[in-house]
Swiss-Prot record:
Domain Helicase ATP-binding stretches: 34-200
Molecular function in Gene Ontology: 3'-5' DNA helicase activity; ATP binding; ATP hydrolysis activity; DNA binding
Protein's name according to its UniProt entry: ATP-dependent DNA helicase Hel308
Annotated spans, Required for helicase but not ATPase activity: 400-691
Gene3D superfamilies xrefs: 1.10.3380.30, 5' to 3' exonuclease, C-terminal subdomain, P-loop containing nucleotide triphosphate hydrolases
Notes on the domains: The N-terminal region (1-400) has DNA-dependent ATPase activity but no helicase activity.
Subunit organization: Monomer.
Keyword terms of this UniProt record: ATP-binding, DNA damage, DNA repair, DNA-binding, Helicase, Hydrolase, Isomerase, Nucleotide-binding
Classification of source organism: Archaea, Methanobacteriati, Methanobacteriota, Archaeoglobi, Archaeoglobales
Organism expressing this protein natively: Archaeoglobus fulgidus (strain ATCC 49558 / DSM 4304 / JCM 9628 / NBRC 100126 / VC-16)
Every Helicase C-terminal domain range: 230-421
PANTHER family to which the protein is assigned, alphabetical: ATP-DEPENDENT DNA HELICASE HEL308 (PTHR47961:SF10), DNA POLYMERASE THETA, PUTATIVE (AFU_ORTHOLOGUE AFUA_1G05260)-RELATED (PTHR47961)
Function: DNA-dependent ATPase and 3'-5' DNA helicase that may be involved in repair of stalled replication forks.
């Protein structure tokens, strides 16, 4: 089907944009599904990676905008939101307004009311409803990318509640779900009252195989071929032909070790001097130096310990072909789109406190990355196994079906978190209405069991915590409404309220309080971390909680204290690399912990204000910047971080006025180029105080 045939549905101007993007003709499944896309009905599209699901959704959103509607495009990760936003901006050429909302959970982002297409995450979209963003009711089309993540232990419940809330808010709402894998597609379609389209067509054919004890067996339809080959040879023969290789390892350590090993191969084919500098721009610690050396030689590792900037450098360089091999942990498979000619899965196991096999759906996500449209004649996905797992790899993973998608909403923590918001948002004023709401969820569709007992227990718990009152009908208290808007677990809100109502806190006391909450990620206590126990005992009078060392909570408590001590070192301006070495974490881990702690510190401070406790008031900004209180005025200035601020402060430069007055001195301390940018920023701000 030629794209010109779409002009009647999306306008000739929109067709012009598609042609500018090099799209002259639709893929076969796109041509088959396009009628359903323009029907206006709810729709579920289950198609492999790169088969063109997103383009179909874009056409639906463009058509919606032409009709005067507004679309919300929901993705699972912030990084994906940024990627989609950049991709959708092409539609601005025909007058559409594209927006993105991924930040502060308390913000309503009212400026997005003028946008035609808004990209966001499911958590942010849910928080926009909780904070009563005025424009959210005007959304007429909801696109859910990766709707199979209803199955996610962590994110699935929020996605399910978001869809249920939005369908209740706007009875005429159109929902479009996109999925690469959906074994029980009819069940999800029934829940959404949707039509569905399923295709296994791929723009680049996929050949899958196993490498077992030096023998590679490839399965291409009904045919199979075999040959003797080593793992390293599989990598090199692909790189030699200018193909990209994506290797999946089960652990970070494995990913780093394999990337270092393979960099000796890729070094024969590339040299990346400039990229090395880009990797070391934000951090020059041990892991970053190892990554920079790999990248210089044309290989890279990719895992959650990398900084966001480093990940972007690696991803962009791999897409351009400057990096030939990326060795990643499985998290990459569900994240950004990085196709490669050959995907090699080094293990079907992952370690999660214990060793267990990955899901078939996880393998399918990894294998789905094989084959770059327009560049490769075919993609290859190869599993490396021992003799014991060969049959499982072939029967279950290569020829087997992904697991059925099941709702994860029935867990108490999810019920507690979402029941409070459902009451606060006015969807339920009685227990019966709360049950009615949950009867519209995917959980009820699948299980057809009442949650009345669990919901009553959750509501009584919220009553005991002072977040809900029941007097003829259910209503949120001031605390309950605040906790819902802050987007924290009600248990987190209760812990904050309980402690802050009765005691003032020191820095370490406040940081430990943050680390006590279920919303906070905690560091693992290693065998070599006996110093944590000693520090906990020394600081016991400053902590809001100190269990007996014989209690079952004691090990958990030590992990809370270790995380709090890590944050304390951060706000005391300890060197970033020293912190990472001391606590056994990577720079990306530290940034993630800091970001979560900043969000929770803000929530803690808001609750502290409600109970008249001022002891935690300056902490959020200190966590954000990683500084002592005396540097706050300097780090608020653009281009001045914790290291530059300390240099300036120690030299007697204390504020913006000092910087402008002593320009030459500032230039000698932080470099002339940076100093000029800082001064320019200060001048602009003084001319435009609101910028």
């Amino acid at each position: 089907m030629k794209v010109e045939e779409l002009a009647e549905s999306i306008s000739s101007y929109a067709v012009g944009i598609l042609k500018e993007e090099g799209i002259e003709e639709l893929f076969p499944p796109q041509a088959e599904a396009v009628e359903k896309v323009f029907s206006g009905k709810n729709l579920l599209l289950a198609m492999p990676t790169a088969a063109g699901k997103t383009l179909l959704a874009e056409m639906a959103m463009v058509r919606e905008a032409i009709k005067g509607g507004k679309s919300l495009y929901v993705v699972p990760l912030r990084a994906l939101a940024g990627e989609k936003y950049e991709s959708f901006k092409k539609w601005e050429k025909i007058g559409l307004r594209i927006g993105i909302s991924t930040g502060d959970y308390e913000s309503r982002d009212e400026h997005l009311g003028d946008c035609d297409i808004i990209v966001t995450t499911s958590e942010k979209a849910d928080s926009l409803i909780r904070n009563r963003a005025s424009w959210i009711k005007a959304v007429s089309c909801l696109v859910v990318d990766e709707i199979h993540l209803l199955d996610s232990e962590k994110r699935g419940a929020t996605l399910e509640i978001l869809v249920t809330k939005m369908r209740r808010m706007n009875k005429a709402l159109r929902v479009i779900g996109l999925s690469a894998t959906a074994p029980n597609v009819t069940e999800i379609a029934e829940w959404l009252d949707a039509d569905y389209y399923v295709s296994d067509w791929r723009p680049v054919p996929l050949v899958e195989g196993v490498l077992c004890e030096g023998t590679l067996e490839l399965f291409d339809g009904a045919f199979s071929t075999s040959r003797r080959v080593k793992f390293e040879e599989l990598v090199e023969e692909c790189v030699a032909e200018n193909g990209g290789v994506l290797v999946f390892e089960s652990t970070r350590r494995g990913a780093e070790k394999t990337a270092v090993k393979l960099s000796a191969i890729t070094a024969k084919y590339v040299e990346n001097e400039g990229l090395e500098k880009a990797i070391l721009e934000e951090n020059e610690g041990e892991m970053s130096r190892k990554l920079a050396e790999c990248v210089r030689k044309g290989a890279a590792f990719h895992h959650a310990g990398l900084l966001n900037g480093q990940r972007r450098v690696v991803e962009d360089a791999f897409r351009r072909g400057n990096i030939k091999v990326v060795v990643a942990t499985p998290t990459l498979a569900a994240g950004v789109n990085l196709p490669a000619r050959r995907v090699i899965v080094r293990s079907l196991y992952r370690f999660d406190g214990y060793s267990k096999r990955i899901k078939v759906s996880e393998y399918k996500q990894m294998a789905g990355r094989a084959g770059r449209p327009g560049m490769d004649e075919r993609g290859e996905a190869i599993i490396i196994v021992g003799k014991r797992d060969r049959e499982i790899a072939v029967k279950r993973y290569i020829f087997g079906e992904p697991e059925r998608i099941t709702s994860k909403l029935g867990v108490e923590t999810h019920l507690r978190f979402h029941s409070l918001s459902i009451i606060c948002d006015g969807y339920a004023k009685t227990l019966e209405e709360l049950e009615d709401f949950f009867a519209d969820t995917f959980f009820f569709k699948q299980n057809e069991i009442s949650l009345s007992y669990e919901l009553e227990r959750v509501v009584r718990q919220l009553e005991n915590w002072g977040m809900v009152v029941e007097d003829h009908h259910l209503a949120p208290t001031k605390l309950g409404s605040l906790v819902s808007r802050l987007y924290i677990d009600p248990l987190t809100g209760f812990i904050f309220h309980d402690v802050l109502s009765r005691m003032e806190l020191s820095d370490i006391g406040a940081l430990h309080l943050i680390c006590r909450t279920p919303d906070m990620e905690r560091l693992t206590v290693r065998k070599t971390d006996s110093w944590v126990e000693e520090e906990a005992f020394r600081l016991r009078k400053e902590l809001s909680y100190y269990p007996s060392d014989f209690s079952v909570e004691y090990d958990w408590f030590l992990s809370e204290v270790k995380t709090a001590l890590c944050l304390k070192d951060w706000i005391e301006e300890k060197d970033e690399d020293e912190i990472c070495a001391k606590y056994g974490i990577a720079p990306g881990d530290l940034r993630r912990i800091v970001e979560t702690a900043e969000w929770l510190s803000n929530a803690m401070n808001r609750i502290a204000e409600e109970v008249g406790n001022t002891s935690v008031s300056g902490l959020t900004e200190r966590i954000k910047h990683g500084v002592k209180e005396e540097l706050l005025e300097l780090v608020r200035i653009r281009h001045i971080g914790r290291v530059r601020a300390r240099k300036l402060y120690n030299a007697g430069i204390r504020n913006a006025e000092d910087i402008v007055r002593h320009r030459e001195k500032v230039a000698s301390l932080i470099g002339r180029g940076i100093a000029e940018r800082v001064v320019e920023g200060i001048s602009v701000k003084s001319l435009n105080p609101e910028s």
